[in-house]
Amino acid sequence: MSILDEFRSFIAKGNVMDMAVGIIIGAAFTGIVSSLVADLINPVIGLITGGIDFSNVFVNLGDGDYTSLAAAREAGAPVFAYGAFITAVINFLIIAWVVFLLVKMVNRVKETALHKSPPAAKAEPAGPTQEQLLAEIRVLLKKASA
């Protein structure tokens, strides 16, 4: 089998396709979570903390005075951008929470499927007991010997 054939076989497997779909959905989900944090959660946190925008919170480690993180980075100033880190932590916590809920839901579905009893098989009609069979054999033997 050539390397090309092995590669085709590898790609055709269901696990690889499932992984590809997961990566694509994950990338889209990351955009949704980033928007959720930047556009909805951070403004509420900023309102509670007196207008602080975490995405723009930084400490300038060099000389100069910059009004925004973007201006400091554009000037090449060394900055400690802990606000961006806080935003990344919030993103991570939201993604981890959603993944936890999804795993919990899948486990519940699996558990329900495992505990579901299989449908009862049709009861087969009861045949004659051993005593009844022996009695029939005895009758047949008596008829045959007579």
Swiss-Prot record:
Per the UniProt record, which residue ranges are transmembrane? 21-41, 44-64, 83-103
Task of the protein: Channel that opens in response to stretch forces in the membrane lipid bilayer. May participate in the regulation of osmotic pressure changes within the cell.
Family, per the entry? Belongs to the MscL family.
User: What keyword terms does UniProt attach to this protein?
Assistant: Cell inner membrane, Cell membrane, Ion channel, Ion transport, Membrane, Transmembrane, Transmembrane helix, Transport
This protein's major location comes to: membrane
> In what way does this protein cross or attach to the membrane?
Multi-pass membrane protein
One Pfam family this sequence matches:
MscL
Full protein name = Large-conductance mechanosensitive channel
Highest classification ranks of the organism: Bacteria, Pseudomonadati, Pseudomonadota, Alphaproteobacteria, Rhodobacterales
UniProt-recorded Gene Ontology molecular function terms: mechanosensitive monoatomic ion channel activity
The gene coding this protein: mscL
Q: Report the domain of life of the source organism.
A: Bacteria
Annotated compartments: Cell inner membrane
